[in-house]
A protein has these predicted regions:
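Substrate-binding clefts and catalytic carboxylate motifs of secreted carbohydrate-active enzymes
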Residues: 1-124, 131-132, 138-140, 146
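Terminal connector regions
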Residues: 114-116, 151-153, 158-171
Length: 171
């Protein structure tokens, strides 16, 4: 038995779709990191609505397991640990919805926000974005003041997408 989440992962990530067990495990760990980062960023963007925080169902594994923990049974960090730490930075730039959630043709749209938990405002603040879709790169930049303990929407990104399978990278 490798933990309560093994059946769910096998259903969502069929092991037969990967060349070996390590490739399958890496795919599931990568998914966990992306999922936690996206969820935490969204909750932080909401700030104090509805509850002002998030919780992990478990921090570490007590034995070898397929689980949602961010540390394994040897107390070594899983990739999700870095994703959680990054999503908890005092100042965070968030794109919502993330480009990875776009599934169709037409235009890819996302909104860019700054979450700032610092006690002092950021002034001046500069946010830059680079979006690469199917090898085409576009840039955006925004400047202004970010108040202490605030969330501010700084701008939007719209980019045409010619294919539903076009890969997008936003940084």
């Amino acid at each position: 038995d490798f933990g309560a989440h093994a059946e769910v992962l096998a259903r969502r990530f069929p092991p037969g779709d990967h060349p070996d067990a390590e490739a399958w495990a890496e795919a599931t760990r990568s998914h966990q990191a992306q999922l936690l980062r996206t969820q935490i960023e969204l909750l932080r963007r909401l700030k104090y609505r509805p509850s002002g925080g998030f919780a992990l169902d478990r921090l570490l594994d007590g034995a070898p397991a397929v689980s949602g923990a961010v540390f394994d049974h040897l107390r070594c960090p899983k990739p999700a640990r870095a994703a959680v730490a990054g999503a908890c930075a005092a100042t965070l730039v968030v794109a919502w919805p993330p480009p990875s959630l776009h599934g169709g043709r037409g235009e890819r749209q996302t909104w860019v926000s700054v979450v700032h938990d610092g006690r002092e405002p950021l002034d001046p603040a500069r946010v830059t974005a680079e979006l690469v879709v199917a090898g085409v790169t576009r840039h955006w930049a925004w400047e202004g003041r970010v108040e202490a303990d605030s969330v501010i929407d700084v701008g939007g990104i719209t980019c045409p997408v010619g294919s539903s399978t076009a890969e997008a990278t936003l940084s």
